Amino acid sequence: MKTFLFYDVETSGLNPVFDQILTFASIRTDLRLREINRQSVTIQLRGDIVPSPKAFLTHGLTNDELALGIHEYEAALRIHKLVNTPETISLGYNSLGFDDEFLRFMFYRNLLDPYSHQYGNGCSRMDILPIAVVYRVFHADIIKWPEIEGKPSLKLDLIAEANNLVTSGRAHEAMNDVESLIELSKKLFSQEETWHYCLDFFSKTKEEARINRIKSDFQIQNRYFRICIMISLSFGSKVNYMAPVIHLGQSLPYKNQSLWLRLDSEAIPGFGDALNIEDAHVIRKRPGDGLIILPALERFWNRMPASSKQLTDENLEKFCSQCEKFFELIQYHLEYRYPLIPDIDPDASLYQDGFFSGKEKKECEKFHLAGKDRKHEIVDQLQSPRIKILANRILDRNFSKGPLQATSKEYQCHLDQLRSVSEANKIKGYKGDTKYGRHEALEELKELESTFLNPDPDQRKMMAWLNDYIKEF
């Protein structure tokens, strides 16, 4: 039986590669949103994580609460099993933009398949946030939409408050947010035709079929292009969350990416400004990723502001008159490859190193099946360099007790890098970003202390703990 697994996470910071999940809450329902069961997992703060003060002041999780949790490795096994239960559709609120990537990298560094919950055993993913945006555009009367200083907001906690959605806990508490999400989904589900129409945007085959049915009928020289409408929260309320786009084609090195260019930009690099075509912001869409593509039908087109339509006409005219430059822009972005990061940290190497090979999967399985007392022995037998280093980190993070000497030299070096203020010692991610360290946390604390007005007793207690913990890291 197909089921929804609504879930939410609270985390130590905002980086899905290097920060960790602290709490995971889920409620499984049938497809008519009737509850079947619920699960919650609390995870101890890892020894190599410097907590972000802003994150902790937002969710309010205390060190005492986290100390009662389980190690990340055990939590990863438990959560992986939940989202990989056959016929599970896992979904959250902005889950494809945030939570799911946290899950993916947690699974990866704990030697679990980071992608199987997307396609294996009839499993798949969804996200309620893009669906809420569609309702905001086309069925705005379905709920009350909150505003902040006169601007519409789609924040879940504000929607819950504005619509009196019944929950059992505090905002930014994982289970409370899951309850809010299901109550919101029930309201959206009341408009069943739209609900089911939106669900198909998260089916790879159905979404691709929809896009392929849209005619490529805009001609530039001897080539034909699809003009469509894309819907995304990121476009903002000023343009009604809608943007006219032109389909440039499929990425050559990354077959699952289709490339789109916004047509309502006031300046497109390479066309009348000082920038080059390499600087053009091309949207890289993956099937079922929550970027909604609609045909440029009049009833949709007329919901965009006049300025968007005017800029579209002007930009299409530029492309037609400077077609060789436009084709050059297309070819550059179709052929573009992400740069390799030579000193990327092993935790961050998922996209650069790719899927686990068949041999690596067998080594992962061997590690998982070994008892706690035999895992060190198994690690010594591993042949794959990346599996070996990730397995060693699992041991250091989850199975080391006693003095610092109980952990590996590699792990001690990792901790020293987090304490260092030197740029040369930064731990590198796949985007060229770096792992949050003690210096950044102390700077963030200093900023909060000067700007955070009238903290309540719990917040003062949290700030004091963060100050002590980070300084002693």
Stretch-by-stretch model annotation:
Residues I70, T85, E472-F473:
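Conserved, well-structured beta-alpha core segment at the onset of a catalytic domain
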